[in-house]
Amino acid sequence: MESLAALYKNHIVTLQERTRDVLARFKLDALLIHSGELFNVFLDDHPYPFKVNPQFKAWVPVTQVPNCWLLVDGVNKPKLWFYLPVDYWHNVEPLPTSFWTEEVEVVALPKADGIGSQLPAARGNIGYIGPVPERALQLDIAASNINPKGVIDYLHYYRAYKTDYELACMREAQKMAVSGHRAAEEAFRSGMSEFDINLAYLTATGHRDTDVPYSNIVALNEHAAVLHYTKLDHQAPSEMRSFLLDAGAEYNGYAADLTRTWSAKSDNDYAHLVKDVNDEQLALIATMKAGVSYVDYHIQFHQRIAKLLRKHQIITDMSEEAMVENDLTGPFMPHGIGHPLGLQVHDVAGFMQDDSGTHLAAPSKYPYLRCTRVLQPRMVLTIEPGIYFIESLLAPWREGPFSKHFNWQKIEALKPFGGIRIEDNVVIHENGVENMTRDLKLA
């Protein structure tokens, strides 16, 4: 494999091309991209954890340093002002020298408010991309050039097409997340609490809670029915029945987002359902290819859900087609089949149909689907089907003409297990699909 430095060099070439195109389209001279700033907790002097501007880390793998600035014009070497204060209260990151610094001009910025004296005097035609509009106004950036929608839409649209450098980073993030999942399963099997399982995961991935790309979902038993459960009980339940782990990792700013579900016992109805969801997930991925709408795969999986509901006698005396048509699969899988993945976990532009930002909403029947794009090579997406037993979604079906088709006794027996989700991260290629997760032998 090419070195990361060589891949990064080509990555910058691609970003420079996109920059030239977007500047010409919107008649701008350059983009000033701000890493962001620290924001204090209300009525306190402690800041919230820093989260870098994703458009900034698209260019440079600097994810922990606020008050940095990047000036790009698509022609000259990108110029990075790296915040380097004299500060004995806090850790100060040294001026970077790494695989990427040959491609970027790196200059120390000793004072956060010193950027004004470093920029070109004429700034009326510079676009600001960042989270602090008032800072841009102070720098005499025109209000119309602060996060201009057309520029943002263009940049977001092309972020769907990962460079080889980005794919290499995402494969590294996968390795870290897979290590975490293996450690977490072992912790679950040894009877640990959600809190302690989370610690085992973080230790294995080398992350702290503020480093992971999203809050880990560490859900034992019925907690697996809460789609974004992040509470972390300190006490292990008296009986371990099930474990759903939705947790990722980050490498050079790029995310992994994996989910696995385990049954404490290997021979009960729940364990068999977990195996079948896993098998159907793999079967769907095997059918994926460029040129097909992501929506189609979501709809196809509802047909697979119907097959499982029928096989496991959760829904009875109804055809699979009728289940999907009447949305009886909906309460069992209330979320989308997945989402774009990259610099952000729910990566941008999932609904954009072109680089002008044309929006295609999710089908009204499936409003929580996060992507309606036609799959193309270099796109990275999650495939994360699930089956859950969520009372608030099942309750409306307890009355009415379809109630008789629900095997309520079976559902009540499965509710203490919460639910099931299996999630892999896949890359679309010209001639097939790369499953980054399964390539690392994560069962």
Curated annotation (Swiss-Prot):
Xref: Gene3D superfamilies: Creatinase/methionine aminopeptidase superfamily, Creatinase/prolidase N-terminal domain
InterPro entries on file: Creatin/AminoP/Spt16_N, Creatinase/aminopeptidase-like, PepQ_N, Pept_M24, Peptidase_M24B_aminopep-P_CS, X-Pro_dipept-like, X_Pro_dipept
Residues where Mn(2+) 1 binds: D257, H339, E384, E423
Catalytic activity as recorded in UniProt: Xaa-L-Pro dipeptide + H2O = an L-alpha-amino acid + L-proline
GO cellular component: cytosol
Highest taxon of source: Bacteria
Keywords (A to Z) from UniProt: Dipeptidase, Hydrolase, Manganese, Metal-binding, Metalloprotease, Protease
Any one GO MF annotation of this record: aminopeptidase activity
Entry annotated with the keyword Zinc: no
EC id: 3.4.13.9
GO biological process: proteolysis
UniProt-annotated binding residues for Mn(2+) 2: D246, D257, E423
Family statement drawn from the similarity comment of this UniProt entry: Belongs to the peptidase M24B family. Bacterial-type prolidase subfamily.
Its job: Splits dipeptides with a prolyl residue in the C-terminal position.
NCBIfam families, sorted: PRK13607.1
Protein name (database record): Xaa-Pro dipeptidase
Name of the gene this protein is made from: pepQ
